[in-house]
Amino acid sequence: MRMKKKRHGAERMYLLSSLVCNDAVNLVENREEIFKNSYPLRIEIGCGKGDFIKEKSKADKDYNYLAIEKIADVCVVAVEKYAQSRGLGCLAPNGGWKKSDSTIVPLGSSPVDFSGDDLGNVRFAVGDAAEMLSKLPDSSIDAIFINFCDPWDKKGYEKRRLTYISFLELYSRILSKKGKIYFKTDNRGLFDFSLEQFEKSPFKIVYSTYDLHSSDMNKTNIETEYERNFTEKGFKINMLIAENNK
């Protein structure tokens, strides 16, 4: 389903530029300056509206995160949601940004000045994840999260799947040794396909289940907005964790 275009989406994203870093290489190379710490960097491919990354970054505070989303009108929702969760303000009625001190920064203004505020351990990027990741240095990432990606069900589209062997080889290169991939999907066909691809790859599957919400792993599971909706409709969630053995 195509998402309705967000009113003033580009302008809203621009106001929160402090939380956006579309140059993933710069983020990796200057992570200590950007995050003000030396914690390992993790990546979420396809962050959607940001429920997962918002909660994951709270649960695992000793990591930094880059949340990548291809669709700008989806990513702006995630950025705003995260900013509000950090106490940095909220969306103003006119589409501008209302800071925590109640100052209104209207649309068309320069980016919101968050100097002195703690921006937390997440930055966002809009663009094609594969293109961004292909430019990253070897062994520069601690973990990758792939939640409910497009299954590309049509015949002949297998190579577009984010768990196709060529993607797994890319992930292996940029992940540290023993770095992990966390993969969730409601699509059984995609999951079985992914299990086969991982077996051909440098990764070792250390955990898998066809019913995440009935497993012990559910105790620490953080739901995405998509996952919550489809679980309520009776869909079972498949999950695997794979470790990089390059």
Q: In which residue ranges do the predicted regions lie?
A:
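A short glycine-rich, Lys/Arg-flanked "PGG" loop and its adjoining helix->strand segment in the class I
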Residues: 163-177
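SAM cofactor-binding core of SAM-dependent methyltransferases
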Residues: 40-85, 119-130
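A short acidic, Gly/Pro-enriched loop at the edge of an enzyme's catalytic core
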Residues: 134-143
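A short SAM/SAH-binding and catalytic strip from SAM-dependent methyltransferases
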Residues: 142-161
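Intrinsic disorder/low-complexity segments
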Residues: 86-117
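S-adenosyl-L-methionine
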Residues: 1-43, 51-60
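Conserved beta-strand signature within the Rossmann-like core of class I S-adenosyl-L-methionine
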Residues: 178-185
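Class I S-adenosyl-L-methionine
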Residues: 191-196, 201-246
